[in-house]
Amino acid sequence: MSDYLVKALAYDGMARVYAAVTTETIKEAQRRHDTWSVSSAALGRTMTGTLFLGAMQKEDQKITVKIEGDGPIGPIVADSNAQGQIRGYVTNPHVHFSELNEAGKLDVRRGVGTSGMLSVVKDLGFGENFTGQTPIVSGEIGEDFTYYLATSEQINSSVGVGVLVNPDDTIEAAGGFMLQLLPGATDEIIDEIEKNLMALPTVSRMIEAGETPESILAKLAGGEDKLQILEKIPVSFECNCSKERFGSAIISLGKEEIRSMIEEDHGAEAECHFCRNTYDFSEEELKTLYEEAK
């Protein structure tokens, strides 16, 4: 099944809800970055959370999330847009612990760390950016997105993200949900939301069992009839890197740096952090870039 995200209203229009299956997308990220279990779970959770923030944006806006904890995984970076296109990378892809956490799951908190920052940069278009930053509160990532939304954007939310990793490090299931309270929500509605959240199985297990974004939202809302579906968006791993972009980056290094590439290395190879694609520049190509540099 192809990955997709569903936006809806629930609780008499008092909550905006999102759910997504991202299994194929996270499989692609795992394949590109050769991530081991804990790194896969952390990267997949971050990418899914970033996907939800991207889905909140306007058509031409982009969002970049960086989670920088004190654990062995190092910084995790993901970016997404309103069209469901997402990419991401983790600094140390080879983190695996033989011991599970107290809940019997992969110990993502230990991998990410419990001290550090979650940063969000919104590219609003026209060269205008908005940056928000909150401390990591758990290292489990879903709770950290929840805290960011409440603190930096003043939106009371609940974010649940999960990745089920097979013993051979392949991805079995991935996805998540996000619920946001809208102004006017009553105490009764909040109580009902809390009750439904408590009864919700873990995201990755729901997706492994074949649940769709629509059926996850129905559980979240307390019934399919209580949902007003707004939009369905395809989700995929997409990277917009290109040789031209890397050429521009090389030009920005300046003539001295390019001269050293020509004289010492007789060429250059650039690798995209996000997708691991590589771009080779011959000595002749570097000479052309040298002429364009200042």
Swiss-Prot record:
A single BP term in Gene Ontology: protein refolding
Keyword Disulfide bond: yes
Keyword terms: Chaperone, Cytoplasm, Disulfide bond, Redox-active center, Zinc
GO cellular component assignments: cytoplasm
Lineage: superkingdom: Bacteria
Location (main, coarse): cytoplasm
GO molecular function annotations of the record: protein folding chaperone; unfolded protein binding
Bridged cysteine pairs (disulfide): C239-C241, C272-C275
Cellular compartments annotated: Cytoplasm
Changes after translation: Under oxidizing conditions two disulfide bonds are formed involving the reactive cysteines. Under reducing conditions zinc is bound to the reactive cysteines and the protein is inactive.
CDD domains recorded: Hsp33
NCBIfam families from the UniProt entry: PRK00114.1
Similarity section: Belongs to the HSP33 family.
Role of this protein: Redox regulated molecular chaperone. Protects both thermally unfolding and oxidatively damaged proteins from irreversible aggregation. Plays an important role in the bacterial defense system toward oxidative stress.
Record protein name field: 33 kDa chaperonin
Gene: hslO
